Amino acid sequence: KEQVDGDAEWAEAQPDPNPNDKMKNIFLQSRDDSISEPPANAGEKIVLVDSINHALDEEMAHNELMVIYGQDVAGDKGGVFTATRGLTDKYGEGRVFNSPLAESSIIGTAVGMASLGYKPVVEIQFGDYIWYGMMQIRNEVATMRYRSNGKWACPIVMRVPVGGYIHGSICHSQCIDGYFAHLPGLYIAYPSNAADAKGLLKMACRMEDPIMFMEHKGLYRQGFAASPEPDKNYLLPFGKARIVQEGNDVTIITWGALVQKSIEAARNTGLSVEIIDLRTLNPLDMETILTSLQNTSRVIVAHEDNLNNGFGA
C-alpha cells in the first residue's frame, strides 16, 4: 500500500503532457528505411506459402528468442496452410508450439512474452476469427509504446491469412485490412508475391513495433505469385511500394490478390497503365503514389473488400 500510495503521489505531481508531443512514440522514432532489392542470382522459384515458411525458418535461426505459436502450427501439420511445417522438428516444442483455440489468449500471451524480451510470431488461423482478440490488439498491442511514453514496446508479429478465392464462404474469406489500418501504432504488411512476402516477413521479425502480417490465402500456391527466392540476407523495409509496370494514362493502386487482377485487366485496354503494388498499408508510400499521379493525373484504386469503407476508400 505504501508503494502504491507513493507512486500515486508521484504521478499526481507530474506536469501535464505537452500537446506538441502528442504524435510522439506511436512507433519507434527511428526505422531502417534502406531498401535491398532481390539479388540477381536469386534461387529457385517458390510459391508464397513456402516463402513464409523459409522466412520463419531463417529468422528462428537468427534470433534464439523468437517463438512461433498458434492453432495447429506445431508438429507435422504445420498449420492449416503448412506455413510452419517442419519448424517444430527443427527448433523444438519449446519454440514452436500449439495454442488453445482462443485468439484473445494467443495475442494476450504474446504481449506478455514480448514484455519479457521474447519475439512472439503468432498465427491467427483465419482473419475471420481475429475479432476475439480485438481488445488486446486495439487497447494493448497498438498502444503500448504510446501510453508508456516510449518506455515499453510490443514488438510482436501477427500472421493472419485473409481474403477470398478459396470457396471459404462468409467465415473464411473476410478482408480485414480496412479495420486495422485505422489503428495508430500498428504496422500492416500485405504482400502480393513470394519474394516480397519473404523480405517483408523477415523485416517484420526484426522490427521493434507490432506488425500485422496479412497473407492472402488465395495466393499461397498460385503460380503467378511465385518468385525466385531471395537469400537469407534479403530484408524489405516497410513503406516502399513497387511499380509493377509503368504507364502514362492512368495509375492503378492496389495490393494483395488484386495486383495480378489489375495486370490482367489492364492488358487489353489499349491504355498505358501504371500499376503500383503498395506492399504495406501502414506505412503507406505516399511519395510513390503522388509521383505517379503527377504523371498520369488519373487513378483507380483496386481493392478486395465490402462495397463500403474498405481501405481503398
Specify the residue positions occupied by each region the protein language model found.
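Generic alpha-helical secondary structure signal
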Residues: 2-5, 17-21, 50, 174, ...
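Thiamine diphosphate
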Residues: 1-13, 23-214, 218-219, ...
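Intrinsic-disorder/low-complexity detector
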Residues: 1-30, 34
